[in-house]
Amino acid sequence: MSKISDFIGKSAVENVNEALRRAREIEEYNALLSLTEERALERAEKVDAGEISGRLAGVPFVVKDNFLAFGAPTTAASKMLENFNAPLQATAVEKLEAEGAICVGKANLDAFAHGGSTENSAFGPTKNAADKTRVAGGSSGGSAVVTALDVVPFALGTDTGGSIRQPASFNGVVGIKPTYGAVSRYGVVAMASSTDTIGCFATNAEDTDLVMEIMAGRDDKDMTTLPDFWNNQPEFAKKKIGLVKQCMTDDVDAEVRQKTLDYAEKLKRLGYEIEEVDLSMMQHSLAMYYIIVPAELSSNLARYDGVRYGHRAAEVKTLAELYGRSRNEGFMTENKRRIMIGSFVLSSGFFDAYYMQAQKARTLLIDEFKKLFTEYDALLMPVAPTPAFKIGENASDPIKMYLADIMTVPASLAGLPAVSAPAGNSDEGLPIGVQLIGDYKSDKNLLKLVSEVEEI
């Protein structure tokens, strides 16, 4: 099943040139914001000369354009960082390059990763790999599309509330949000520091596992990282999986529900018992998320002021005007909306009523997950209520857009690993994914489970 293995042992220069050729062939999807051609070919020549080696020697990959990486600007798909060239690389990128992998480009996203469709990019929306009239999902839409269209065998993304899992589902690839702290966030543009995670897309679980194993582990530059646990996880022993009943109601598209049930049948064939379970705090998770995350991102985005770095407004007369105009010109509408929400819930009059209450509710959600994992190896649910929607369909309705995250934010708030796995296509040919959520530090076991289903 591995596609990465197809690149191993071949000419790295040929691998890179083929990836660049494919990237140019799919320009109409607007999945890539830049190519790192010059640097990629330089590294490829060193691989072929034996100067660079490793488990991924000569394998091309793409990073979401909120990862700092050499060879092209890091824009976060925003005007604010349009011409920003990073002085360093993200730890995740460094680890992959240390194993010989070659970054060939940077993928489109919702600006600053604020969105669920990759429509909120300053450089235009990314189109779905299966249907160019539909969204790619977000915020890591570009990374999902280049993986689905075989530009590269894997691509990196970030997942704060579903930003890997949802585009993976919409484009028919595997995507993982790891345990919080599994992979260093150093060198990645911060969104919400308590839920940001680094993951990847691939066409199969085996490749996903390899990439994550390489990236995982302690990093002194990110104090939230965990000691490497990737290959030290106890096997699933309960042989029971919980099907979350809140996700199987009439509010969820009928085809999505059926594909989830079909996936459950495959798990039964592997010897797992499937039982319906109650995740009652899920109904409050979206409200928690859209209080906690905007609060954190409004603080993280305060650094973009037109003084230290980023877009700077021209012809200003006062410092206040410089701050105001630089941020107004550099941020997209969705960025401003989330900053305003975050500033509101952190204000002195509402901090206790909103932010602190959301954090208390978050603890209850975590406790509910903990209780379920005393009985079940994993939880099964859809990734999103529907397959990919039309470009522009939800663009003017932020609440409807936020509701698409209802099934992905619970695992994010709890810091749990979750994998989006392809489950087939709708009658219209649109990919549908299912989500497997595991207990803390059970990431590899989830991918092993997906791999076993892939073989059925």
Locations of regions flagged by a protein language model:
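Gly/Ser-rich catalytic/binding loops embedded in alpha/beta enzyme cores
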Residues: 1-160, 262-270
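Short, well-ordered beta-strand elements within core beta-sheets of diverse protein domains
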Residues: 3-10, 62, 80-84, 196-203, ...
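Acyltransferase
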Residues: 13-16, 45-48, 252-278, 310-311, ...
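Short alpha-helical scaffolding segments that buttress acidic/His motifs in well-ordered protein cores
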Residues: 15-19, 288-289, 335-343
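Residue-level signal for inorganic ion chemistry
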Residues: 19, 40, 89, 208, ...
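Glycine-rich, small-residue loops and helix-cap segments
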Residues: 58, 152, 274, 296, ...
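Short glycine/serine-rich loop segments
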Residues: 89-90, 94-215, 412-423, 430-433
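A short helix-breaking turn/cap at a secondary-structure junction
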Residues: 177-258, 263, 321, 325
